[in-house]
């Protein structure tokens, strides 16, 4: 959905744009191709590996920071308002495909899952040090698993005998919760739970969305791709109401005062795109314009 996501920004040739999930640089390249010589693009990525993809273009600045700090680092670069922000949430293909990062269920690797090596908390810490209450919380809240308590207890029971060091160890501990017909799906939910906790993904997303309102100029666009229901729920609510919970205030005439105008309906990838990139199957694109 690269074209649709960048189309959603309604790019002005001399505008200022932000790609907060630079990754391999695909979206940034497309944005730059539509900008004129006076346009500017800022990329954010906390992953040190992403710097290998930095683009040699004087209109482009790559900021090696988490996008939860978008306002601070745009200000640091002399930017108070922007015309569009793009976010492609979740784990990049590179992160999934490098075994030692520990993101994928396909490889045996140390339990890491950090999107930045600067972060102290790893998947190993969570699996081996979190108590039953917190393990249950992340599996129930972030994995939406009905048997979260049983999974938490199984992990604690296993680690009392020996540390759970790598992904293969974790799979063995979880084996009884992985029926053949659903093993991949359930394991993915458990991995997702741990990864979200390691990287504080829900808190980061909330902070980013709130700051997007502050840095977007009037008429500026927000284009966001999410990959699971937790992310999409937050994005949908925020774009609709400017809030994560509750209802917005009403004006004198009883109309809800909302900061965004929704642009079109939610977009999902075509069957053709899913055939080319199976990881896109759960993607949902939402676009909004600041009033």
Curated annotation (Swiss-Prot):
GO terms for molecular function: rRNA (cytosine-N4-)-methyltransferase activity. Transmembrane segments: none annotated. SUPFAM superfamilies: Putative methyltransferase TM0872, insert domain, S-adenosyl-L-methionine-dependent methyltransferases. GO terms for cellular component: cytoplasm. InterPro entries: RsmH, SAM-dep_MeTrfase_MraW_recog, SAM-dependent_MTases_sf. It catalyses: cytidine(1402) in 16S rRNA + S-adenosyl-L-methionine = N(4)-methylcytidine(1402) in 16S rRNA + S-adenosyl-L-homocysteine + H(+). The keyword Cytoplasm applies. One of its GO terms (biological process) is rRNA base methylation. S-adenosyl-L-methionine binds at residues 25-27, 45, 73, 88, 95. The keyword Glycoprotein does not apply. Keywords: Cytoplasm, Methyltransferase, rRNA processing, S-adenosyl-L-methionine, Transferase. It is found in: Cytoplasm. Its EC number is 2.1.1.199. NCBIfam families: 16S rRNA (cytosine(1402)-N(4))-methyltransferase RsmH. Belongs to the methyltransferase superfamily. RsmH family. Specifically methylates the N4 position of cytidine in position 1402 (C1402) of 16S rRNA. This is Ribosomal RNA small subunit methyltransferase H. It comes from Flavobacterium psychrophilum (strain ATCC 49511 / DSM 21280 / CIP 103535 / JIP02/86).
């Amino acid at each position: 959905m690269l074209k649709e996501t960048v189309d959603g920004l309604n790019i002005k040739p001399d505008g200022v744009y932000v790609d907060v999930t630079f990754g391999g640089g695909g979206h940034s390249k497309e944005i730059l191709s539509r900008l004129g010589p006076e346009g500017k693009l800022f990329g954010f990525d906390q992953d040190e590996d992403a710097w290998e993809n930095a683009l040699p273009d004087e209109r482009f600045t790559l900021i090696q920071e988490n996008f939860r700090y978008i306002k601070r680092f745009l200000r640091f670069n002399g930017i108070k308002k922007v015309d569009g922000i793009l976010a492609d949430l979740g784990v990049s293909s590179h992160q999934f495909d490098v075994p030692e990062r520990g993101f994928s269920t396909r490889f045996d690797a140390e339990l890491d899952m950090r999107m930045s090596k600067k972060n102290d908390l790893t998947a190993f810490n969570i699996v081996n040090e979190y108590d039953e209450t917190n393990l249950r919380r992340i599996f129930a809240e972030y994995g939406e698993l009905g048997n979260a308590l049983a999974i938490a207890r199984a992990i604690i029971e296993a680690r009392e005998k020996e540390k759970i060091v790598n992904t293969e160890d974790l799979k063995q501990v979880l084996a009884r919760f992985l029926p053949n017909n659903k093993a991949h799906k359930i394991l993915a939910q458990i991995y997702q739970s741990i990864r979200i906790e390691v990287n504080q993904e829900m808190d980061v997303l909330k902070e980013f969305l709130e700051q997007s309102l502050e840095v977007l100029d009037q008429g500026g666009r927000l284009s966001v791709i999410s990959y699971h229901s937790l992310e999409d729920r937050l994005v949908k609510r925020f774009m609709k109401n400017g809030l994560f919970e509750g209802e917005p205030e009403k004006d004198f005439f009883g109309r809800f005062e909302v900061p965004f105008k929704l642009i079109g309906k939610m977009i999902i990838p075509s069957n053709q795109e899913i055939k080319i990139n199976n990881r896109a199957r759960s993607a949902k694109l939402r676009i909004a314009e600041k009033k």
